[in-house]
Amino acid sequence: SKLDDQVMIGHNCRIGAHSAIAGCVGIAGSTKVGQRCTIGGGAGIVGHIEIADDVHISGFTLVSKSISQPGTYTSISSTPFTTHADWLKLAAHLRHLDTYAEKLKTLQDKIKQLEQDK
């Protein structure tokens, strides 16, 4: 495994073979990180959880629960922790939130008008 500068690893942690951890990562105690994992800079991992083999954690992600499936995980900003693919969908939807709100308001107005016409 490769560790960058400023990496803090708590008590009783296990880091799997062939994993890479970038700078300023914090891993709390009794966490198990699988083999062939990468953890991006500034990420934080709470204690007493397990991370499966072949997991890739994006920089500045806060991992707050165990990860049992391989893949890339992202939790940037105030969005909930999720798979990277789901995070990308969420980010795309957030960009269109104003449009969705306008459409919803239009539908609500139409429903109100239909109810008044009865």
Feature map (PLM): residue ranges:
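Glycine-rich hexapeptide-repeat left-handed beta-helix
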Residues: 2-118
